[in-house]
């Protein structure tokens, strides 16, 4: 599993995390231009910025998926004894990428607020751009710092879930169709907050998994997101366990790994018949040659 994690990290690279850090710094510092805001409220405003999350963070998360969306070769899969074991361990492993992205963002946001006065209260100046959102969050969280922690953890889990969903889509449809499906889902996420007609439809897209306050619009919205996510998880688990990789040969090997894989590939009926024909041919040739010599 460690080797698989290293491979996916190498495929992913660290350029996206650097881009996230730079973009997050720019977005966060621009939020300081309003002035008159405490440190805790500043970091909460940065981590909950709809435009930053929708048009910058979400594309980076989706682009990260395509670094490891393809299945590994059969020799790698056979090391895990079953396909569902391979998929689950790969999904758990790419969680490290979600942790790195979240840690980079958190570090950038915390750095951007250096120098601001401390004030872990909800009192906000009238007319502030965050007033509408903060008035909603004030009813759910005891302090801005608590809300910041919850938003960060939700984004971490949401990124990991998006990775798994994209991997699942990628297996069934292939990279070409996965790109099209992901683009459609992203467009739906991007226009969701702009079109009230779409908000009234009980749909769950990437934005609901990544942005916590997108689940606060309607009383039933958290239930819709939770039910859809549960349905997705059950579908993924069922398909991984019973339906996935049905076209591959079901190997029943006492040992697993590269040696077992190549033994299976070499010991086919065709190869065995060829081997027997060669042995019989050599035997007959030697026998006939020995008889002629006598």
How does the language model describe each region?
Residues 1-68, 171-172, 176-177, 190-214, ...:
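Hydrophobic alpha-helical transmembrane segments
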Residues 117-129, 187-204:
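Juxtamembrane non-transmembrane "cap" segments at the membrane-aqueous interface
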Residues 89, 181-182:
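Hydrophobic core positions of alpha-helical segments in small-molecule transporters
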Residues 72-73, 168:
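A residue-level signal for alpha-helical anchor/packing sites in multi-pass solute transporters
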Residues 25-67, 88-175, 207-227, 291-293:
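Secretory targeting signals
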Residues 77-84:
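Short helix-to-coil transition segments within interhelical loops
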Residues 85, 177-178:
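Residue-level recognition of membrane-helix boundary sites in multi-pass small-molecule transporters
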Residues 144-145, 152, 183-194, 293-294:
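Nucleotide-cofactor and metal-assisted catalytic machinery
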């Amino acid at each position: 599993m460690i080797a698989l994690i290293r491979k996916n990290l190498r495929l992913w690279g660290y350029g996206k995390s650097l881009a996230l850090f730079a973009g997050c710094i720019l977005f966060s510092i621009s939020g300081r231009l309003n002035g008159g805001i405490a440190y805790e409220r500043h970091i909460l405003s940065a981590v909950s910025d709809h435009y930053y999350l929708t048009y910058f963070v979400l594309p980076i998360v989706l682009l990260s998926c395509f670094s490891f969306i393809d299945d590994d070769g059969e020799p790698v899969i056979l090391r895990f004894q079953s396909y569902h074991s391979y998929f689950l361990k790969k999904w758990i492993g790419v969680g490290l990428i979600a942790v790195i992205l979240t840690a980079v963002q958190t570090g950038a946001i915390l750095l951007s607020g250096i120098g601001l006065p401390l004030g872990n209260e909800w009192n906000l100046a009238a007319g502030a751009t965050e007033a509408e959102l903060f008035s909603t969050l004030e009813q759910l969280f005891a302090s801005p710092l608590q809300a910041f922690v919850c938003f960060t953890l939700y984004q971490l889990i949401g990124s990991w879930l998006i990775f798994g969903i994209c991997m699942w889509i990628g297996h069934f449809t292939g990279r070409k169709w996965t790109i099209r499906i992901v683009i459609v889902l992203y467009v739906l996420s991007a226009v969701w907050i702009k079109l009230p007609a779409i908000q009234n439809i009980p749909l769950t897209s990437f934005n609901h998994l990544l942005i916590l306050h997108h689940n606060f619009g309607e009383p039933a919205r958290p239930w819709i997101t939770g039910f859809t996510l549960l349905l997705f998880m059950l579908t993924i688990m069922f398909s991984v366990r019973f339906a996935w990789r049905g076209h591959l040969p079901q190997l029943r090997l006492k040992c697993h790994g590269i040696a077992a894989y190549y033994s299976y590939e070499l010991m086919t009926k065709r190869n065995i018949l060829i081997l027997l024909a060669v042995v019989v041919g050599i035997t007959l040739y030697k026998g006939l040659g020995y008889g002629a010599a006598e």
